[in-house]
A protein has these predicted regions:
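ABC ATPase "signature
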Residues: 241-242
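Conserved ABC ATPase signature
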Residues: 156-160, 164
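A short, surface-exposed alpha-helical micro-motif characterized by mixed small hydrophobic
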Residues: 223-225
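Conserved ABC ATPase "signature" region
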Residues: 83, 134-151, 260-261
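Helix-to-loop junction immediately C-terminal to a conserved catalytic motif
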Residues: 67
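Conserved ABC transporter NBD signature motif
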Residues: 75-83
Length: 264
């Protein structure tokens, strides 16, 4: 693992804060709510960085901020050394291609009117990943990468199980050769037995393509299994940030201790 941290980080966040304005009414003035407070982290090529915290801790807000879905008020986010707040419109497509997300609910993130070939091929065509006459073969490769066969390309989302749908979401996400994959509660909607197979698949793909993961979950045991390092978020703040094994052995914060106790 040590060689992962020998180079420069692919993603660096420096003292980022994100505010939301709460609605004002007749009796109250407009107030701001700090969703992220002074967040700093480094993500290295080939690393899996776990983000753990309860609902409302700021996990998804942080991922949306990294993806430029949300703007942030303070701090700096560098992707491959470049400040993402200064990315120009023409560079945004390339930026978004390099950072892909796998969502929690695979059924909600798949178009029910499209078959699997259409779903996977759409981003390939949009980003011109390969020649037009190579698209079908590319989809065959991707479907094989996620442990399914070619017959699935003609099926529709409603014909698949939850685990199979999540595999399709993974195939679509990796179809554009991203550098960073954000897994946002990407196995929490699946049965426990299916979770393990999808987690193992993500690890296999990481080894094959040297992917870099940000793995977001409220399940500490899942995060420990996947991650090299773990960040614990509480009320928009980082309260713990260390190697996965060390975090369990020597948690720095009482909230981390409570999470560990609750996971057994």
């Amino acid at each position: 693992i040590k060689h992962i941290y020998s180079g420069k980080p692919i993603l660096e966040i420096k003292n980022v804060s994100k505010f939301y304005n709460t609605s004002k009414n007749l009796f109250r003035n407009n107030k701001s709510f700090k969703a992220l407070s002074q967040i700093s982290l480094k993500l290295f090529k080939g690393e899996t960085l776990g983000l753990i915290g309860e609902s409302g801790s700021g996990k998804t807000t942080l991922s949306n901020t990294i993806l430029k879905i949300h703007e942030f008020e303070k701090g700096e986010i560098l992707f491959k050394g470049k400040d993402i707040s200064k990315i120009k419109e023409r560079e945004l497509l390339e930026f978004r291609k390099n950072l892909q997300i796998i969502f929690q609910d695979p059924y909600a993130s798949l178009n029910p009117l499209q078959n699997i070939f259409q779903i996977i091929s759409e981003p390939i065509k949009f980003h011109r990943i390969c020649l037009k006459n190579e698209v079908y073969e590319k989809c065959k490769e991707l479907i094989a990468d996620v442990g399914l066969n070619e017959n699935f390309l003609s099926r529709y989302p409603h014909e698949l199980s939850g685990g199979q749908r999540q595999r399709i979401c993974i195939a679509r996400a990796i179809s554009v050769n991203p550098e960073v994959l954000i897994c946002d509660e990407s196995v929490s909607a699946l049965d426990v037995s299916i979770q393990a197979t999808v987690l193992n698949l993500l690890n296999l793909l990481k080894k094959k393509y040297n992917f870099t993961y940000i793995f977001i979950s409220h399940d500490l045991s899942v995060v420990k299994y996947m991650s090299d390092k773990i960040i614990v978020l509480y009320n928009g703040k980082i309260v713990d940030y260390q190697d996965a094994d060390l975090l369990f052995e020597k948690p720095k914060d009482n909230y981390t201790k409570k999470l560990i106790k609750a996971s057994y």
